[in-house]
Amino acid sequence: MKRKVAVIGAGVSGLAAIRSCLEEGLEPTCFERSDDVGGLWKFSDHTEEGRASIYQSVFTNSSKEMMCFPDFPYPDDFPNFMHNSKLQEYITSFATEKNLLKYIQFETLVTRINKCPDFSTTGKWEVTTEKNSKKETAVFDAVMICSGHHVYPHLPKDSFPGLNRFKGKCFHSRDYKEPGTWKGKRVLVIGLGNSGCDIAAELSHVAQQVIISSRSGSWVMSRVWNDGYPWDMVVITRFQTFLKNNLPTAISDWWYMKQMNARFKHENYGLMPLNGTLRKEPVFNDELPARILCGTVSIKPNVKEFTETSAVFEDGTVFEGIDCVIFATGYGYAYPFLDDSIIKSRNNEVTLYKGIFPPQLEKPTMAVIGLVQSLGAAIPTTDLQARWAAQVIRGTCILPSVNDMMDDIDEKMGKKLKWFGNSTTIQTDYIVYMDELASFIGAKPNILWLFLKDPRLAIEVFFGPCSPYQFRLVGPGKWSGARNAILTQWDRSLKPMKTRVVGGIQKPCLYSHFLRLLAVPVLIALFLVLI
């Protein structure tokens, strides 16, 4: 008899979970509170309680070759960085092509998940749902939670003295949809994340003045990287990860900061992070530096206090006549249908083994998919998480002991503090994390073996983009088209730009970084010979 799995949410994480369950012979039932798939990427012109929300102009920060489901490339003519409507089209196409829609119960709200009385022996869960004011409870062998992120806004009003006296508008970026309302107004955006920068840059075209207040600064990256290629196809490679993790810290930090400052000097723009060597996820915005140069956006430090019409910053400067304050201050995690102690088992912090499994459960029958954040794309990450989780639920993969899992969490927390600083998010190194998950299910590519067996593919895998197709080359869920997808990824990336053909397709030299590094010892050797 097939094991029944409840999947909560039909965004990209939920679809990955459904598909992984089917691949492992499990029986998924997905509960989605809205009327469509897509989750965060399904745009609505109004906000709804308990649902993720985006603004109309949102584009992806990851390119199409790096953020696809590993066996489902985007159409050739799709742009590298997509408008949310284009990504929603892809997500819907994936759900349809993989025949996943029949496993989803739409407009169904999960109100409660409880352990069954015999949980310690069976690992089963009682899931209560509500649809059309009618409640139902069903028993499942396992639960995969694929919601809860980007839903519950973090609005730290208590951190800003005098805000209660402020007479202008005040709201979270979750409620922002389009700029027209604020034409000719003076707007303060608090927060220097992706949403804050996007909203500030967009508003600066219609508002009288826009100020961004940032407590700690941030690196701001462009989607357009060296020689005009998508940033992640150049930066997220196994070779660069190898260098970062093996070079002396001083050299690694120097190289990282050099990359971050390649486009412009962050100090000159007031954007420089307080600790520039931390690998916190940077902000992606192609327009912000230009808006700062044009004077329509200014960067200020943290707000010290508010008055009825102004904000006083920590440097003593004042922004007068404010019409609106937008808090782009991120989101918290919340699972109102679940006992908090299951996910936040220690110090009220999210405590999950590999960012997925609650370690204290007697049976490993609950998994949280899509909570981990890294510099890589969400879709391939959730796909690999779901594949491993499905195998654990099926029983083909076994988790370590509780003590070992807690020790691993502590170790990862220490590394997180070193590389990413103090943050409430579960942040990790993308390629290291993906390889770790892939190794659990036998899907990690063996690079050395590839160099012997298929040198052309090995060169692309090691020096080229660490694209999602790499994790369907071998093992369970192997895709026969993975090799060709890897070898043709640059063609698909460049095709939508060839609307005016002026020459052949110019692919990047995969060895460029290697050759630059090789030049250093050569120059040193020449210097020693000459003297």
UniProtKB/Swiss-Prot annotation:
GO terms for cellular component: endoplasmic reticulum membrane. It is a single-pass membrane protein. It holds the Pfam family FMO-like. Its cofactor is FAD. The chain crosses the membrane at residues 511-531. One of its GO terms (molecular function) is monooxygenase activity. It comes from Rattus norvegicus (Rat). PANTHER family: DIMETHYLANILINE MONOOXYGENASE (PTHR23023). FAD binds at G9, A10, G11, V12, S13, E32, L40, W41, N61, S62. Keywords: Endoplasmic reticulum, FAD, Flavoprotein, Membrane, Microsome, Monooxygenase, NADP, Oxidoreductase, Phosphoprotein, Transmembrane, Transmembrane helix. Detected in liver and kidney (at protein level). Expressed in kidney and liver. Weakly expressed in lung. Does not seem to be expressed in brain, adipose tissue, or muscle. It is found in: Microsome membrane; Endoplasmic reticulum membrane. It is an enzyme of class 1 (oxidoreductase). Its main location: membrane. Signal peptide: none annotated. One of its GO terms (biological process) is taurine biosynthetic process. The modification Phosphoserine is found at S401. Its EC number is 1.14.13.148, 1.14.13.32, 1.14.13.8. This is Flavin-containing monooxygenase 3. InterPro entries: FAD/NAD-bd_sf, Flavin_mOase, Flavin_mOase-like, Flavin_mOase_3, FMO-like. It catalyses: trimethylamine + NADPH + O2 = trimethylamine N-oxide + NADP(+) + H2O; N,N-dimethylaniline + NADPH + O2 + H(+) = N,N-dimethylaniline N-oxide + NADP(+) + H2O; hypotaurine + NADPH + O2 + H(+) = taurine + NADP(+) + H2O; (S)-nicotine + NADPH + O2 = trans-(S)-nicotine N(1')-oxide + NADP(+) + H2O. NADP(+) binds at T60, N61, S195, G196, C197, D198. Belongs to the FMO family. Essential hepatic enzyme that catalyzes the oxygenation of a wide variety of nitrogen- and sulfur-containing compounds including drugs as well as dietary compounds. Plays an important role in the metabolism of trimethylamine (TMA), via the production of trimethylamine N-oxide (TMAO) metabolite. TMA is generated by the action of gut microbiota using dietary precursors such as choline, choline containing compounds, betaine or L-carnitine. By regulating TMAO concentration, FMO3 directly impacts both platelet responsiveness and rate of thrombus formation.
